[in-house]
């Protein structure tokens, strides 16, 4: 009634306004998008009509338009930050009459799309409609109790971790911790992860996560090859390894001409002298628990390195692989409090000895000191990574699964060593009780080998037993027609064991219960494999076992890290855009989170429908014919795309085509990925405008015409411009027998305006964690699905357990192999991109690209009088990112990009991408979801810093001792008793007026990178060592 009364009053007011303009109200008829949801009723003059006088009050009766009845919770206006009025004003500031004229001048006409239209969700779903749609999909998934195992297990995710990390934008919107001074929280958590891994594996070095267990095993295989300097070309894999791991290793080995042999342990043969390494599983994929001590001694005696894939929960009670003699240990931390999620994302790990530290893939966190000498954390040994060493890098892996590693680390912190041991013993006890019960039943045969959590059963008809289990909503693993395995986990109950007895009884009565026979069950672990070495002894793993304490610890770490909750993160080529809450919500729904990746597909029809819809939408957006959702990172997508091209050439008999042309401006992952595929890399330069030198490219293509495999190109270029000759570049490659691989890192400037397929690319990976809104998670997760033209679709990756391929499926299939451990990669985070695309609609997502370009050009225009803008397109505009040239400042003021980035921290900002793709520069990418006010604030900060630099150039402040060289300035430095700086504390802390209202504070002074690598420490140190260092510098 109240709403009706208000509407009537507003109607009369509008009617009076129409007949008496002198009382018009701008507030009511403002075109702003911020007008309330009532605005359609009160601003639509065309809907007002005169009618008869009612009750003598002169009331006007009005019709209501259909538009007024549409839902008001549309999404594009929440994601695309600039209002229409701001768009016009910003375009005018840049020198154009409106947004569209700017876009016309920026995107080459030769590649411009007239329009893009979705076949589904074209107008975009509202947020409430999207939630309802996702709930409908979720209802089509069936949650069965999983006993499949094979590296994936149900787990009880502590709700304090679920709510305060996985669902917390303060954790999931952070970027990779390149700016260590504003990342000490997640760096500490990742150091906890590394410490947990080293303690449990018994090896001294661990990285901060890898993509999945299978990928980690493939990386370990590559390490073995590198350790042997490529002189031994055979790698043996034990048949007791997970099938997906075996297939991933086989696929990876093709790229560097390594022969993979799968064999039973008893048949291993080193007599050829050509074996670089072996891979074994501990415990085995079918549950068997073997003592590898003598096996490893024999391998070492033959000069062979041993990789062991292991299970973290098992290692809490089993002798660690390091003590058995393993050289490298890999595995997954999924069962440490991370949902199965139909395959991921999960944090894998790789641990090894100090001897091989520089051959390790992935990020590694190390302990260093800051400029005051106090302990501080940072990413260590970055010089071995792909963004520096390119094709000579240890791996193409960038950051991997930091968010999930943090969850697993907090799980370890929350439970502590005793809690983990209790969980492991309970799981082992349930498995033992089940095995004992089956022996009592006598209907099947139980394996005699010892086991940890997985029981192998021989039976007359495995399919019949599995079908009976399905009736009880349980999934078992069918190994073959006479073999089943049953894997137990943290969520299994004693009642589940009783149900399993009924399943295996095959109709016979069960004269006992699990509870009744449990006291008779003996530990199945041999005494020689029982763990005796303590682990997780550091206080951090023994302090936070109540929810209140862990909550405060999580909050304390979060407070040290800058995220999108605080300010824009304008990293070029990283696309740090809004990760909307509606997009994130389905990720933690049990109907998506609690499905095993190898569950029957009929139990995951909601997922399957989403995959189909998403594949169709991505094909529309990119101009491709089919997509694979399997690659679970951008780097994995690059590798997969190149392997598709390789498979295509092989199928045509062109085995010799192995030359890959790569511009010098390419992402470092490009040459690293090409090297992994066994390609010979030829680089081509750029011209003075930042474009690929087409004539140099033409000569390289023609000179290698017989052997040309591919070109890798990023569009728009990494220099932040739309190259006018991109269609000609594609034609040159095709005319010389090659395929065009497009790096999708800059797709945020293409969507709706052009497309890789339209331009002429044959294959492209998409960084869903950039363009399509999956959060960066402080260094992962990501997703890198690949789209291909029709002729490449048959070669898209498949999977040995659940066959997959292209979406839509091609007519024929000749899959290249397996890229990731799970059939659809990190399926759990695909709803994020799916909801973004569906809610934006074709027009909203096209406008996102336009506004991203507008924001970049606006910032470039604001900054151009203070810093040179290095590259522009033919009409003087930039794409969605641009490069600021700081090189002259090194000579005039001694200032380098790192100095500017550190001073930006004092202004409350994360620095842009430093010294890439051009050394001595900053690359800035604002994205479409940052407001004009935020853009202005960042520009003001950079302009203010330029004024500070000018003071150095004028000689007014010291060349080496100034506010920029001293940045950042944490509170402990500002509050110290002694202040010896030649500038005031106040100016160091508050260089801009907005900071007085709210400021993000760094927690350390500038971190010493060189010290950290020269004194490499990659695990938690005893507290007394930190205290001694702190006292020494006090």
From Swiss-Prot:
The keyword NAD does not apply. It catalyses: N(6)-[(R)-lipoyl]-L-lysyl-[glycine-cleavage complex H protein] + glycine + H(+) = N(6)-[(R)-S(8)-aminomethyldihydrolipoyl]-L-lysyl-[glycine-cleavage complex H protein] + CO2. Its cofactor is pyridoxal 5'-phosphate. GO terms for molecular function: glycine binding; glycine dehydrogenase (decarboxylating) activity; pyridoxal phosphate binding. Keywords: Mitochondrion, Oxidoreductase, Pyridoxal phosphate, Transit peptide. It comes from the Eukaryota. GO terms for biological process: glycine decarboxylation via glycine cleavage system. The modification N6-(pyridoxal phosphate)lysine is found at residue 770. InterPro entries: GcvP (IPR003437), GDC-P_C (IPR049316), GDC-P_N (IPR049315), GDC_P (IPR020581), PyrdxlP-dep_Trfase (IPR015424), PyrdxlP-dep_Trfase_major (IPR015421), PyrdxlP-dep_Trfase_small (IPR015422). It is found in: Mitochondrion. The glycine cleavage system catalyzes the degradation of glycine. The P protein binds the alpha-amino group of glycine through its pyridoxal phosphate cofactor; CO(2) is released and the remaining methylamine moiety is then transferred to the lipoamide cofactor of the H protein. Belongs to the GcvP family. Homodimer. The glycine cleavage system is composed of four proteins: P, T, L and H. This is Glycine dehydrogenase (decarboxylating), mitochondrial. It comes from Flaveria anomala. The gene is GDCSP.
């Amino acid at each position: 009634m109240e709403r009706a009364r208000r509407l009537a009053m507003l109607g009369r007011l509008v009617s009076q306004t129409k007949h008496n303009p002198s009382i018009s109200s701008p507030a009511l008829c403002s075109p702003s998008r911020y007008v309330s949801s009532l605005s359609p009723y009160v601003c639509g003059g065309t809907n007002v009509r005169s009618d008869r006088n009612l009750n003598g009050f002169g009331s006007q009766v009005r019709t209501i338009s259909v538009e007024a009845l549409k839902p008001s919770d549309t999404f594009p206006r929440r994601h695309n930050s600039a209002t229409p009025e701001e768009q016009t004003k910003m375009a005018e500031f840049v020198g154009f009459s409106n947004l569209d004229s700017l876009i016309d001048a920026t995107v080459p006409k030769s590649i411009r799309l007239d329009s893009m239209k979705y076949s589904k969700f074209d107008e975009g779903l509202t947020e409430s409609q999207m939630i309802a749609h996702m709930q409908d999909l979720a209802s089509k998934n069936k949650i069965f109790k999983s006993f499949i195992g094979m590296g994936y297990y149900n787990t009880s995710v502590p709700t304090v971790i679920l709510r305060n990390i996985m669902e917390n934008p303060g954790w999931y919107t952070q970027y990779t911790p390149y700016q260590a001074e504003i990342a000490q929280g997640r760096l500490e958590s990742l150091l906890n992860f590394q410490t947990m891994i080293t303690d449990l594996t018994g090896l001294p070095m661990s990285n901060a996560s890898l993509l999945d267990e299978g990928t980690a095993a493939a990386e370990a295989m590559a390490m073995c090859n590198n350790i042997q300097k490529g002189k031994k070309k055979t790698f043996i894999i034990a048949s007791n390894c997970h099938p997906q791991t075996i297939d991933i290793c086989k696929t990876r080995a093709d790229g560097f001409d390594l022969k993979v042999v799968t064999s039973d342990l008893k048949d291993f043969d080193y007599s050829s002298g050509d074996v670089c390494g072996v891979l074994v599983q501990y415990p085995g994929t079918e549950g068997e628990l073997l003592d590898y001590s003598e096996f490893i001694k024999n391998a070492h005696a033959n000069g062979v390195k041993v990789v062991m894939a292991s299970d973290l929960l098992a290692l809490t009670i089993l002798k660690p692989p390091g003590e058995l003699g393993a050289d490298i240990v890999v595995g997954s931390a999924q069962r440490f409090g991370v949902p199965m999620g139909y395959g991921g994302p999960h944090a894998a790990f790789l641990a090894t000895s100090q001897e091989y530290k520089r051959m390790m893939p992935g990020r590694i966190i190390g302990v260093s000191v800051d400029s005051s000498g106090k302990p501080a954390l940072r990413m260590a040994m970055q010089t071995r990574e792909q963004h520096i060493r390119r094709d000579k890098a240890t791996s193409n892996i960038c950051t991997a699964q930091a968010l999930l590693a943090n969850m697993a680390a907090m799980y370890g912190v929350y439970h502590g060593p005793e809690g983990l041991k209790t969980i492991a013993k309970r799981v082992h006890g349930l498995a033992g009780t089940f095995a004992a019960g089956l022996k009592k039943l006598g209907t099947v045969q139980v394996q005699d080998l010892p086991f940890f959590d997985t029981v192998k059963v021989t039976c007359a008809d495995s399919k019949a037993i599995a079908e009976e289990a399905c009736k009880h909503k349980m999934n078992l693993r069918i190994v073959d027609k006479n073999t089943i395995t049953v894997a137990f986990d943290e969520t299994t109950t004693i009642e589940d064991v009783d149900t399993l007895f009924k399943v295996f009884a095959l109709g016979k009565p069960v004269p006992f219960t699990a509870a009744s026979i449990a006291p008779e069950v003996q530990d199945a672990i041999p005494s020689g494999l029982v763990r005796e070495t303590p682990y997780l002894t550091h206080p951090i793993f023994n302090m936070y076992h109540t929810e209140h304490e862990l909550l405060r610890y999580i909050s304390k770490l979060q407070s040290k890290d800058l995220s999108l909750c605080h300010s824009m993160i304008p990293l070029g080529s990283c696309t740090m855009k809004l990760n909307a809450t509606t997009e994130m919500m389905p990720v933690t729904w049990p109907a998506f989170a609690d499905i095993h990746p190898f569950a029957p597909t009929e139990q995951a029809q909601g997922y399957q429908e989403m995959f189909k819809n998403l594949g169709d939408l991505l094909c529309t957006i990119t101009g491709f014919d089919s997509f694979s959702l399997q690659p679970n990172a951008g780097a994995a997508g690059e590798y997969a795309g190149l392997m598709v091209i390789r498979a295509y050439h092989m199928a045509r008999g062109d085995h010799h085509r192995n030359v890959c042309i790569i511009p010098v401006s390419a992402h470092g992952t490009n040459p690293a990925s090409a090297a992994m595929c066994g390609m010979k890399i030829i680089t081509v330069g750029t011209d003075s405008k930042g474009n690929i030198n087409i004539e140099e490219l033409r000569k390289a293509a023609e000179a290698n015409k017989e052997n040309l495999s591919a070109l890798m190109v990023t569009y728009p270029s990494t220099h932040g411009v739309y190259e006018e000759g991109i269609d000609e570049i594609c034609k040159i490659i095709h005319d010389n027998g090659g395929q065009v691989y497009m790096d999708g890192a800059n797709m945020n400037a293409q969507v709706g305006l052009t497309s890789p397929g339209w331009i002429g690319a044959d294959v492209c990976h998409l960084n869903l964690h950039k363009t399509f809104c999956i959060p960066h998670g402080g260094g992962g997760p990501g997703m890198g699905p690949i789209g291909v033209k029709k002729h490449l679709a048959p070669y898209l990756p498949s999977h040995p357990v659940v066959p997959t391929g292209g979406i839509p499926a091609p007519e024929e299939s000749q899959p290249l192999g397996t890229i990731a451990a799970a059939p659809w990669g990190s399926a759990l985070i695909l709803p994020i991109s799916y909801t973004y695309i569906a809610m934006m609609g074709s027009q909203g997502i096209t406008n996102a690209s336009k506004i991203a370009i507008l924001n970049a050009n606006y910032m470039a225009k604001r900054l151009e009088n203070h810093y040179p803008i290095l590259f522009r397109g033919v009409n003087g505009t930039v794409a969605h990112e641009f490069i600021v040239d700081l090189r002259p400042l090194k000579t005039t003021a001694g200032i380098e990009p790192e100095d500017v980035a550190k001073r930006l921290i004092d202004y409350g900002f994360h620095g842009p991408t430093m010294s890439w793709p051009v050394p001595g520069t900053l690359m800035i990418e604002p994205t479409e979801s940052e407001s004009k006010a935020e853009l202005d604030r960042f520009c003001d900060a950079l302009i203010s810093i330029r004024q500070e630099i000018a003071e150095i150039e004028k000689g007014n402040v010291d060349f080496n001792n100034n506010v920029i060289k001293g940045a950042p300035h944490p509170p402990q430095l500002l509050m110290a008793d002694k202040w010896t700086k030649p500038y005031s504390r106040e100016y160091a802390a508050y260089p801009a007026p907005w900071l007085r209202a709210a400021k993000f504070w760094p927690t350390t002074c500038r971190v010493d990178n060189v010290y950290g690598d020269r004194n490499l420490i990659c695990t938690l140190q005893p507290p007394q060592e930190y205290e001694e260092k702190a006292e020494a510098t006090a």
